[in-house]
Design a protein with these regions (language model features):
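A contiguous, low-structure linker/loop signature
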Residues: 61-111, 125-128
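Intrinsically disordered, low-complexity regions
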Residues: 24, 36, 47, 51, ...
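Short, solvent-exposed loop/edge-beta patches enriched in aromatic
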Residues: 15, 47-56, 66, 125
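Catalytic domains of carbohydrate-active enzymes, especially glycoside hydrolases
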Residues: 39-59, 182-183
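Residue-level detector of functionally special positions within alpha-helical transmembrane segments
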Residues: 2, 46, 50, 74-83, ...
Length: 315
């Protein structure tokens, strides 16, 4: 059985053995790991560790090629970021017309040539492919207002929030469709990320989530399913209160399972959602990996494997 076949079995809950993904270590850890294992890049790293799958993020493969070198989103108007609450260009906006006149990015400047080359290289090495634009619309909208302003404007200027969200999502939707038209048959799972939780709870209420997130969110899951792909959502934090909504919206698998966030322990998740979701992750990165012993890490991986069963990707 190839890794792609095994990964497909995991996603379809037909596997007899869990998978493994080495994840996305932070730069300092990555430098150390690459040196220790004598590898040069993420591709070689995954092969060395025997990863079942590989994440190919278009942003890391020169997808955006604006002739003037402009980024596709510039929420701070060229200013350097110093906090998540830093006011963005729409911090004081109260008029949808201002949003409509803003120079939103044109997906025609997306070039997936290098991304597709990496996809082909990954398949040739017998690894399943996770890909798609990161599509972190929730974060992007937040940046265009500043986090506090964003949450306030959901109540004071909801039409402005919805307009900004629509423009950002439209860019990602068109970019993803351009990629999917070229390579959907080679992408095993659409992987995108929006962190909806903090350590203790959701960042916004479930009611606000239903109004300002879900109508956009479901567009991405529907698009991926239209092209025959499963959907893996990355969402850090305590998101237990909206997991049923995410399942209803078409999420097939969930990452990273922030083990120490409230309500995200493996026992609860496996019992509550194990029939509906494939879990990717779950190994505690806040305490266990940085401070635990090798034996403790091994024991925890075995515990997670036993809880989630064979239809699980250790990461």
């Amino acid at each position: 059985m190839t890794n792609r076949e095994r990964f497909a079995n995991i996603l379809n809950k037909k596997s007899d053995h869990c998978g493994f993904w080495h994840g996305n270590p932070n730069p300092a850890s990555q430098e150390y790991l690459f040196g220790s294992l004598n590898v040069k890049n993420d591709f070689e790293f995954g092969l060395k560790l025997g990863s079942t799958c590989r994440w190919i993020m278009p942003d890391e493969h020169h997808v955006w090629k604006h002739p003037d070198g402009k980024p596709y989103f510039d929420p701070l108007g060229g200013q350097e970021r110093h906090s998540l609450s830093q006011p963005g260009v729409f911090a004081e906006c109260e008029d949808v017309d201002e949003v409509e006149k803003y120079p939103w990015p044109d997906p025609k400047y997306c070039d997936f040539t290098e991304t597709i080359a990496e996809i082909d290289r990954t398949i040739a090495a017998d690894q399943a492919v996770l890909s798609g634009m990161w599509s972190c619309f929730f974060h992007n909208v937040c940046d265009y207002f500043g986090m506090e302003n964003y949450f306030i404007k959901m109540y004071t200027d909801p039409d402005v929030v919805e307009a900004v969200t629509e423009h950002i999502a439209d860019f990602y939707m068109q970019a993803n469709e351009a990629l999917f038209r070229q390579a959907a048959d080679r992408i095993d799972m659409f992987f995108f990320g929006n962190d909806f939780g903090s350590q203790l709870d959701l960042l916004i209420s479930p009611e606000a989530f239903d109004r300002f997130v879900m109508p956009t969110f479901v567009k991405f899951t529907n698009l991926a399913h239209k092209y025959g792909m499963k959907v893996l959502l990355h969402s850090c934090g305590s998101i237990d209160r909206v997991i049923p909504r995410l399942i209803d919206a078409g999420v097939d698998a969930l990452h990273p399972i922030q083990a120490r966030a409230r309500g995200m322990d493996a026992v609860h998740l496996s019992q509550a959602y194990g029939k509906d979701l494939v879990f990717v992750g779950g190994v505690d990165t806040q305490e266990l990996l940085p401070f635990g012993t090798p034996r403790q890490v091994r024991d925890e991986v075995r515990r997670l494997r036993d809880l989630f069963g064979p239809n699980y990707v250790v990461s």
